[in-house]
């Protein structure tokens, strides 16, 4: 027994085949095996055995992967009245005609059928079920494998099978039903069987309990110690033998055996059809028990056995047509299918014009107008209100008459203040057409340095061409900030557009989030901001080419010791000049 157990454990797992047996009552002894017959319409590969008598409850059994190479047979010899699943088959029939010997088959053997008196034939199932004679109405249905088999069948069927003993290790299935023969060629042919089990005279059986476990002893203990408590031993009650109906479904390559086909219900009993779940070899026993208690299985729904095909098709079409189909967002086609579920509220399309090109239909729909100052206006215009009030600067009444012009007084005051300061540099004229940002490159104060970097990042993201003036690199820029801000304390960063102050880092961030900064700086957008200056590397300052940054003049007095050296007049106090390309 130990040798057989070790041989079975070395086998590869047998996946893809399991069998369902539905029996309302306990069956008695069944005859020796014969060649298999099946109909080509089954769908699931599981095996169920009904343990109790006079009950329609089925016991599910899921063959585990450790059951590879086991010899499967239903029933027992005529002497006993069991309904268990054994791994060996005793061919010693209790008949006075001819005594038979006990054999243990090393291949997978499935016997389904009623008891029919006949001779025992040792043969191999045919590779393709080509020829088969007409069988009786109660011809047995058997699945056998290559090797030595014991077939108890009609003489015509036994004569058609080839009597060879080669081990090809593949399952051959023959379909035979009342003289009509069908061949299942391609779907079921890949079950590998063991070939190293020797024949022994010792009778060893594995009794399968209702939880799906099999045990090498008669106590029905799977090793957990709970099988005897949860599952009592089955009652042995002999019943009349019925020839079951075997169905083979090619779609999922599974086998289903239905014994209720020939069962005749009594007039007092009403049949209650319960959908059966077909389990695979990897299902757990707990899952099988839970699914068997349910009144409806998933396989029956997916297979369409409960609903007509036309009704299922109408339901699927209705579900697809029920949801609205979103194909565009803001007039633009969706790049991905999931883009229809996102809603973006960022003002990304307000400035759709790309570097002066206004050919886009979306840009034309926005009705942007060029902010050109009116010819009747003389003086300085506030840069923060010029873009908003260029098209709607006039004040109109309800009847449409013009009652005035917006911000005319404000612009007049700005012009008056500029004319009253002749001694102060006119930065509006100096910085006309420019965006100037005063920053610092000194990183000692982290907060100030981070704010400067953030403002520069915002301007570069908007592709704005601006002039950066580093007050840490030049004393001249520090003096400009004091004059512009009219304060001795210098606070950076500060943004100026057309010579007018826009604000510090907080104001720039707020304008950027509201979208006003994009509209304000739209005339200064340039693709040249994506490129770095090759001369200065983006620093906008270069060492003086005259003194090479040493501040010593080339015109030195080498004859007297009164004047040691003259300072260079071409650069600033640190020996730097502005980049000519920037």
UniProtKB/Swiss-Prot annotation:
Biased composition (Polar residues): 217-227
Domain Glutaredoxin as annotated: residue spans: 423-528
Source taxonomy: Eukaryota, Metazoa, Ecdysozoa, Arthropoda, Hexapoda
The protein, known as: Glutaredoxin domain-containing cysteine-rich protein CG12206
GO terms classed as biological process: sensory perception of sound
Top-level taxon of origin: Eukaryota
Ranges where the record places region Disordered: 217-244, 260-300
Similarity comment: Belongs to the GRXCR1 family.
PANTHER family referenced in this protein's UniProt entry, alphabetically: GLUTAREDOXIN DOMAIN-CONTAINING CYSTEINE-RICH PROTEIN 1
Residue spans of biased composition, Low complexity class: 291-300
Pfam families: Glutaredoxin (PF00462), GRXCR1-2_C (PF23733)
Annotated source species: Drosophila melanogaster (Fruit fly)
TM helices/strands, residue ranges: none
InterPro entries named among the record's database cross-references: Glutaredoxin (IPR002109), GRXCR1 (IPR042797), Thioredoxin-like_sf (IPR036249)
């Amino acid at each position: 027994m130990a040798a057989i157990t070790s041989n079975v454990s070395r086998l590869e797992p047998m996946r893809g085949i399991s069998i369902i047996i539905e029996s309302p009552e306990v069956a008695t002894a069944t005859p020796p095996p014969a060649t298999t017959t099946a109909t080509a319409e089954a769908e699931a590969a599981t095996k169920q055995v009904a343990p109790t008598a006079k009950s329609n409850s089925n016991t599910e059994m899921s063959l585990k992967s450790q059951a590879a190479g086991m010899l499967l047979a239903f029933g027992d010899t005529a002497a006993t009245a069991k309904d268990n699943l054994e791994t060996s088959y005793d061919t010693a029939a209790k008949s006075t005609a001819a005594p038979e010997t006990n054999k243990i088959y090393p291949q997978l053997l499935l016997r389904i059928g009623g008891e029919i008196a006949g001779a025992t034939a040792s043969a191999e199932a045919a590779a393709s079920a080509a020829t088969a004679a007409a069988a009786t109405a109660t011809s047995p249905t058997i699945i056998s494998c290559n090797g030595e088999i014991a077939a108890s069948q009609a003489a015509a069927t036994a004569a058609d099978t080839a009597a060879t003993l080669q081990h090809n290790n593949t399952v051959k299935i023959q379909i035979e039903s009342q003289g009509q023969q069908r061949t299942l060629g391609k779907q079921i042919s890949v079950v590998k069987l063991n070939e190293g089990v020797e024949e022994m005279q010792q009778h060893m059986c594995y009794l399968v309990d209702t939880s799906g476990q099999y045990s090498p002893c008669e106590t029905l203990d799977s090793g957990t110690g709970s099988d005897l408590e949860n599952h009592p031993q089955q009652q042995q009650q002999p019943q009349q033998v019925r020839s079951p109906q075997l169905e083979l479904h090619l779609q999922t390559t599974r086998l289903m055996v239905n014994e209720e086909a020939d069962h005749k219900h009594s007039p007092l009993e009403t049949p209650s059809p319960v959908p059966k779940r077909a389990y695979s070899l990897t299902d757990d026993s707990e899952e099988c028990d839970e699914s068997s208690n349910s009144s409806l299985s998933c396989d029956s729904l997916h297979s369409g056995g409960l609903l007509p095909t036309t009704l299922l098709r109408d339901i699927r079409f209705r579900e697809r047509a029920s949801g609205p189909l979103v194909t565009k967002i803001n007039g633009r086609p969706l790049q991905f299918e999931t883009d229809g579920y996102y809603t973006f509220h960022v003002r990304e399309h307000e400035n759709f014009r790309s570097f002066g090109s206004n050919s886009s239909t979306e840009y034309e729909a926005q009705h942007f107008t060029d902010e050109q100052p009116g010819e009747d206006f003389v003086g300085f215009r506030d840069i923060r209100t010029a873009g908003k009030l260029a098209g709607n600067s006039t004040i109109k009444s309800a009847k449409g008459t013009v009652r005035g012009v917006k911000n005319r007084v404000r612009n007049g005051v700005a012009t008056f203040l500029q004319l009253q300061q002749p001694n102060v540099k006119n930065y509006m004229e100096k910085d006309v057409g420019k965006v100037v940002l005063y920053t610092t490159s000194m990183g000692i104060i982290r907060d100030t340095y981070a704010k400067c970097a953030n403002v520069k990042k915002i301007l570069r993201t908007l592709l704005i061409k601006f002039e950066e003036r580093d007050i840490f690199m030049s004393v001249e820029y520090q003096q400009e900030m004091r004059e512009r801000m009219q304060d001795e304390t210098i606070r950076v960063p500060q943004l100026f557009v057309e010579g007018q102050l826009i604000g510090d880092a907080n104001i720039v961030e707020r304008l950027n989030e509201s979208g006003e900064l994009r509209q304000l700086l739209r005339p200064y957008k340039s693709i040249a901001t994506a490129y770095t200056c090759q001369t200065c590397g983006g620093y906008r300052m270069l060492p003086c080419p005259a003194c090479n940054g040493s501040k010593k003049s080339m015109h030195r007095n080498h004859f007297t010791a009164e004047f040691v050296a003259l300072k260079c007049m071409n650069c600033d106090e640190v020996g730097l000049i502005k980049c000519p390309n920037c």
